[in-house]
């Protein structure tokens, strides 16, 4: 009797406590769904004991074989964007075959054997690591140098000392073969990008040249021939850099020199202009009528703009909206 008398008050006390708690707790049935992982059942008639995982719709439409063929035809920077879609694509993009093709195309002037030696000695046999860390010029867009200067205007009856902000551009498009196109114009980026190729007509004033990239100091030596009655060679020296690893989206303009050349030299080395001026001094010229001139104006750094961004780039803004552009 004594033990029963002791247990009854404790049971009543717990019941009263639960009744009091019910007033403070709101019933939320959806909370019961948290932590419950619903796994799909295997198809009817399947003899497999492994758990069945239903793939996403995009994975059903693109089997692994077709996905591999699509990635094999994509540009390297498009592969980087595709790796952000899902985990499966990220693992697929790490296939070394994609990056091997990109590396051999980017450094095709060095040769296959030399690229394999550099791969094993510096990048631990990883083509993707080589693509990210080795210096290279980008060929999927244009390098643009936007330059502005102030020019005095004509005095009018309202304005006594008018000034104008003049804007012009230097455009460079590189090719993996060691050739490039150069243009100096006041036209906007979105207009020049349409015809910046070797198929452009002579009226577009595109100049062809050759270049080399030094892997030791990331410097680019380039030369362009200005044809005409008095042929002139434009020698360009640049330093390649990037705002992020593997970006290679900036080029500092170190020097810009124009020199005269002989007609005999042009006829013998018309395709390899850089080989013609190799070893020349900055003040050297081979035509006494055309002295060597080292230009100091218009030395703004080049900024890389991919082809898919030329229409929306801020470099298209007029001087009234952007008088100066900080390259960074």
Swiss-Prot record:
Copy the pathway line from the protein's UniProt record.
Answer: Protein modification; protein ubiquitination
UniProt main location, coarse: nucleus
Report whether Transcription shows up as a keyword of the record. no
Q: Which residues cross the membrane?
A: none
Zinc-finger listed as a keyword: no
Key words of the record:
Mitochondrion, Nucleus, Stress response, Ubl conjugation pathway
Where do the record's region annotations for Mystery domain 1 (MD1) lie?
A: 126-158
Q: Where is this region: Mystery domain 2 (MD2)?
A: 163-201
What does the record note about the induction of this protein?
Answer: By temperature stresses.
> What GO cellular component term, any one, is given?
pollen tube
Biological process, per Gene Ontology: protein ubiquitination; regulation of translation; response to cold; response to heat
Localization annotation:
Nucleus; Mitochondrion
Known InterPro entries for this protein? F-box-like_dom_sf, F-box_dom, Hrt3/FBXO9_C
Q: Which PROSITE patterns match?
A: FBOX
Q: What is the reported tissue distribution?
A: Expressed in leaves, flowers and stems, and, to a lower extent, in roots and siliques.
Note one Pfam family from the annotation: F-box
> Which residue numbers delimit the F-box domain?
56-102
Q: How does it assemble?
A: Part of a SCF (ASK-cullin-F-box) protein ligase complex. Interacts with SKP1A/ASK1, SKP1B/ASK2, ASK4, ASK11 and ASK14.
| PANTHER family, sorted | F-BOX ONLY PROTEIN 48, F-BOX ONLY PROTEIN 48-RELATED
Q: What is known of its domains?
A: The F-box is necessary for the interaction with ASK proteins.
Protein function: Component of SCF(ASK-cullin-F-box) E3 ubiquitin ligase complexes, which may mediate the ubiquitination and subsequent proteasomal degradation of target proteins. Required for efficient protein synthesis during temperature stress conditions.
Protein's recorded name: F-box protein 7
Species name? Arabidopsis thaliana (Mouse-ear cress)
Gene of origin? SKIP32
């Amino acid at each position: 009797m004594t033990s029963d008398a002791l247990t009854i008050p404790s049971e009543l006390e717990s019941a009263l406590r639960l009744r009091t708690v019910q007033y403070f707790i709101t019933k939320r049935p959806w909370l019961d769904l948290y932590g419950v992982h619903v796994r799909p059942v295997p198809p009817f008639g399947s003899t497999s004991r492994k758990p069945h995982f239903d793939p996403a719709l995009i994975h059903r439409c693109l089997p692994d074989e077709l996905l591999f063929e699509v990635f094999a035809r994509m540009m390297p920077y498009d592969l980087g964007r595709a790796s952000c879609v899902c985990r499966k694509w990220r693992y697929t993009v790490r296939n070394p075959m994609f990056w091997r093709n990109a590396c051999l195309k980017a450094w095709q002037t060095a040769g296959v054997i030399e690229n394999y030696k550099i791969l094993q000695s510096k990048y631990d046999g990883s083509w993707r690591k080589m693509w990210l860390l080795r210096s290279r010029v980008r060929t999927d867009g244009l390098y643009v140098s936007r330059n502005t200067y102030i020019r005095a205007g004509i005095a009018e009856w309202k304005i006594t000392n008018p000034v104008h902000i003049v804007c012009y551009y230097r455009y460079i498009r590189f090719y993996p073969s060691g050739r490039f196109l150069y243009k100096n114009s006041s036209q906007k980026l979105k207009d020049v990008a349409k015809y910046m190729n070797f198929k452009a007509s002579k009226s577009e004033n595109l100049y062809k040249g050759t270049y080399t990239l030094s892997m030791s100091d990331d410097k680019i030596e380039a030369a362009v021939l200005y044809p005409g009655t008095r042929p002139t060679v434009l020698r360009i020296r640049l330093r390649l850099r990037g705002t992020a690893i593997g970006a290679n989206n900036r080029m500092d303009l170190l020097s810009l020199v124009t020199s005269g050349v002989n007609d005999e030299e042009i006829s013998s080395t018309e395709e390899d202009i850089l080989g013609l001026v190799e070893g020349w001094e900055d003040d050297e010229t081979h035509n006494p009528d055309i002295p060597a001139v080292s230009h100091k104006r218009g030395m703004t750094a080049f900024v890389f703009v991919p082809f898919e961004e030329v229409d929306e780039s801020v470099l298209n803004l007029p001087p009234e909206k952007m008088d100066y552009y900080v390259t960074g």
